Amino acid sequence: MKKLVLCFIVLFLSLNLNAQNLSVFVASSASKAMEEVKNEFLKSHPNDNIDLVFGASGKYYQLLKQGREFDLFFSADTKYAQAIYEDQNTLDKPKVYVLGILALYSLDESLLEGGIEKLKDKANKIHHLSLANPKVAPYGVAAKEVLENLNLDKLFEDKIVLGENISVPVLHVDSNNADLGIVAYSLVSSINHPKGKAILIDQKYFTPLKQSYVITKYAKDKKLAFEFIDFISSQKAKEIFKKYGFDTP
């Protein structure tokens, strides 16, 4: 009996000694999809752990630059992934994993009629329009481009409320703190069971959101990081991303 117990202890310690942990930053736009991707991946790695941290790409780029350790960094664009590469903090060049899509989101379906092109006609009904902060969030930059390209920026400049990342405009709308939001479609697609309704924004109005990742120098000796990246490019992961409303390269 003692030998059996000892065997179990040795096995337990062996499994735990071999267990790997990853710290991964993921832009908020991919938060829900990446949670599912992670869970699917860990089915074949039951002893390992992946900690996902969500937020604005610009904010977490600065934290990484200041010394916060992430093994993988999934940005909402190419800009910050490229910056990490140019800072010589990566093991390889950035790679695109999904293409982001913008949407108008509201609890009031009448504000969505005609799409973004008809927003000017509804300006008097819109008291607050929520966007992600373009200083740190690529989706905020894209939303700003949309407004500028449709000559709506001046019309709405006094009505804009900013969120620190792209999840916040959804919360603003859901809590009636904004009438309308320009958001990541991946957060309000039907699989998310959103409180409001969404309509896609034509991609001709903004620079493509080529969401890219890098493997940082902190993952140098972590086999799990490379295995997870391989899974990201798998058909199964692509199906999950598409399910949430992303395009894939």
Task: Go through each PLM region and give its residues.
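Exported/periplasmic ABC-transporter solute-binding proteins
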Residues: Q20-S44, V53, G58, K65-Q66, ...
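Hydrophobic anchor at the start of a short beta-strand
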Residues: I50
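Periplasmic-binding protein-like
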Residues: D71-F74
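Sec-dependent N-terminal signal peptides
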Residues: L4-L15
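Intrinsically disordered, low-complexity peptide-like regions
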Residues: S14-A19, E69
